Amino acid sequence: MDGATYQRFPKIKIRELKDDYAKFELRETDVSMANALRRVMISEVPTVAIDLVEIEVNSSVLNDEFIAHRLGLIPLTSERAMSMRFSRDCDACDGDGQCEFCSVEFRLSSKCVTDQTLDVTSRDLYSADPTVTPVDFTIDSSVSDSSEHKGIIIVKLRRGQELKLRAIARKGIGKDHAKWSPAATVTFMYEPDIIINEDMMDTLSDEEKIDLIESSPTKVFGMDPVTRQVVVVDPEAYTYDEEVIKKAEAMGKPGLIEISPKDDSFIFTVESTGAVKASQLVLNAIDLLKQKLDAVRLSDDTVEADDQFGELGAHMRGG
């Protein structure tokens, strides 16, 4: 349609925010944008992870490749990842991926000299760049020496066993390998729109109202102790199971409660691996999403645009 516009102005409202957790509302947009944001957070926000391991000495019970795999999965603080270069694009080292602009070097050297088992952990990795280090999950410094807060275990050594290695961490994205994903989990749900027919509800006895409330597997509804009316106490607890709707129909009251998802309102839950803070993860994803949308909007090659962003690219062009 000539003159049609799909322009919207999405809004975000923060509900809960911690270093590794965020919960927020995304409103005034559609599901294609919400899902695009979710996927960018999981697979396209860059982080730094160990990508190359040179084993010098390994007399532990684990093979070299086992240790290299474990090292790759250790989350590293990645606040500066957005400003780093991808090793494949770095002209300072001709793509070798071992310079200060595209990589960070780590060293590890541990040897067990007692009869006590020695735990080699992520805290034994020494970084050449103090801004890129293994994530410290210790919250309370007073318990930092406890067995639960010694870092991620890489291998256990017995007397005489030794592990010495050099590792190179590089910038990457989760689309290439899961070790670069900054997100432990990212989910969103449609915000439910729950409508109670008060006239029909008034025809029910208190016992029937209680039966209706208890038919929901999650505590979505409750009864007002003063008015004795059924009220919505936690709409977000609804899991779209339709049990309360089926109960109303079984009671001969179809239409007593109507529940539908709001197609322009979504509730996001984001958990970070610790590589970047949850708030920064969301902001970085939005920046990357804007870059992608600009590329789609300016692209003359519709096939290329659709490869880049699928259904959202077609939607933006009005297709």
From Swiss-Prot:
Keywords: Acetylation, DNA-directed RNA polymerase, Nucleus, Transcription. Transmembrane segments: none annotated. It comes from the Eukaryota. One of its GO terms (molecular function) is DNA-directed RNA polymerase activity. GO terms for cellular component: cytoplasm; nucleolus; nucleus; RNA polymerase II, core complex; RNA polymerase IV complex; RNA polymerase V complex. The modification N-acetylmethionine is found at M1. Pfam families: RNA_pol_A_bac (PF01000), RNA_pol_L (PF01193). It is found in: Nucleus. SMART domains: RPOLD. GO terms for biological process: DNA-templated transcription; stomatal complex development; stomatal complex patterning. InterPro entries: DNA-dir_RNA_pol_30-40kDasu_CS, DNA-dir_RNA_pol_insert, DNA-dir_RNA_pol_RpoA/D/Rpb3, RBP11-like, RNAP_Rpo3/Rpb3/RPAC1, RNApol_insert_sf, Rpo3/RPB3_RNA_Pol_subunit. Component of the RNA polymerase II complex consisting of at least 12 subunits. Interacts with SHH1, CLSY1, NRPB11 and NRPD1. Interacts with IYO. Belongs to the archaeal Rpo3/eukaryotic RPB3 RNA polymerase subunit family. DNA-dependent RNA polymerase catalyzes the transcription of DNA into RNA using the four ribonucleoside triphosphates as substrates. Component of RNA polymerase II which synthesizes mRNA precursors and many functional non-coding RNAs. Pol II is the central component of the basal RNA polymerase II transcription machinery. It is composed of mobile elements that move relative to each other. NRPB3 is part of the core element with the central large cleft and the clamp element that moves to open and close the cleft. This is DNA-directed RNA polymerases II, IV and V subunit 3. The gene is NRPB3.
